Amino acid sequence: FRNVESKSCCPNTTGRNIYNTCRLGGGSRERCASLSGCKIISASTCPSDYPKFYCTLGCQSSKCASITTPPNSEVDAEAVRCKAACSNLCDFGVTTNQEIQDD
């Protein structure tokens, strides 16, 4: 067996704190990453799409979730436009305080 050092990549300090608390409580890396929004990585840097993913997810859940979408309606088109706007917003100027830590 090869020993692979794993690291956790968290989107921000809150995610890091949740991850660490979970791990201290005996949670597995995978479970704690799932709860905290962190990722388990073997590289020394977070994946390049990581900040965009969380930006888009947060934007869509906070701004687009309230749009009700009956099938084949104009409201459905509004939801699509909202999601596209979030994606465009997050494509430019996304900066986060990602935290990487050895596990």
From Swiss-Prot:
Signal peptide: 1-6
Compartmental location: Secreted
GO biological process: defense response
A cellular component annotation (GO) from this entry: extracellular region
Alphabetized GO MF terms: toxin activity
Database matches in SUPFAM superfamilies: Crambin-like
Keyword Mitochondrion tagged: no
Pfam families listed in its UniProt record: Thionin (PF00321)
InterPro entries in alphabetical order: Thionin, Thionin-like_sf
Positions of disulphide bridges: C9-C46, C10-C38, C22-C32
Main location as per UniProt: secreted
Keywords from the UniProt entry: Disulfide bond, Plant defense, Secreted, Signal, Toxin
Maturation propeptide residues: 53-103
Function statement: Thionins are small plant proteins which are toxic to animal cells. They seem to exert their toxic effect at the level of the cell membrane. Their precise function is not known.
The family this protein is said to belong to: Belongs to the plant thionin (TC 1.C.44) family.
Designated name of the protein: Viscotoxin-B
Organism the protein comes from: Viscum album
